[in-house]
Curated annotation (Swiss-Prot):
The keyword Cytoplasm does not apply. One of its GO terms (biological process) is carbohydrate metabolic process. The active site is at E156, E161. The gene is porB. Residues 38-291 form the GH16 domain. It catalyses: Hydrolysis of beta-D-galactopyranose-(1->4)-alpha-L-galactopyranose-6-sulfate linkages in porphyran. This is Beta-porphyranase B.
Amino acid sequence: MKLSNQFLITITLLITSITFAQEAPHFKPGEDPRQPHQEWKLIENMSDEFEGKKIDEKKWQISGQGWIGRAPGLFLAENISLNNGSLQITTTMLPEPIVKNNKTYTHGGGYVGSRNGMTYGYYECEMKANKTFMSSTFWLINEGKDRLGCDKRTTELDIQESVGQITNDADWMKYFDQTMNSNTHSRNIPEGCEYEKGSSKGKAELGGKAYEDFHVYGVWWKSKDEIIFFLDGKMQSKVTPPADFDIEMYLRMVVETYDWNPVPKDGGMTGSKEDRTTTYNWVRSWQLVDSKN
């Protein structure tokens, strides 16, 4: 069967655009921090275009790795799907409350975590939040269970945490549904280890609600003491974490409940499935390396 020239041109352009899209992180002109002798290398085992029919569980873990969710939100693998080239995590109301570990769960969320970790690099995703009181997030955290000594401490790098419906009257929550809420956390310091406990924040305005449109949320984990946050390819803030961020961390895409943004009286699940779904079009992780040329 002969293929038309127009069809071949279309396919070629499509393949070229896909390839080009993965040559470097999403930066606006003049924002790429790489030097002339450097290039961005895509880290395949921490990146995904979500083009398949089901999530790649060799790359992503969807059961929570022992973390079942903060009550009243329970992580459910059935709430995670791939649809039209996107990863979707849908919030739900459970048919009946479930009691686990003496805690009552009434809602369902979802957890997607990378099986592989990395240190310094650039991490980004294109995400649109759900409209509910539950979260839409993109972040990194270390895993201390197999670590020794002071490396058992916790380091967490929150690139974006938002909600679609604010149910808390606190001043700091006023714009949580329309900002890029970024953070660095240091906690669980083992006894005898001289690391600071605390948090250092970054913030940027989205120009609308987090659920109204897709945004590209990114972070350049430049060094142990310099974190730079990007929104839609533009640098927003630089943060010095409270302790050295030099431990390998793993990606997390999580939809959960927050105890500081409680369930509304109507249960918060009255919207359509689309309204109740957080969508990730892609996630990409990069390392800055010396050019081969």
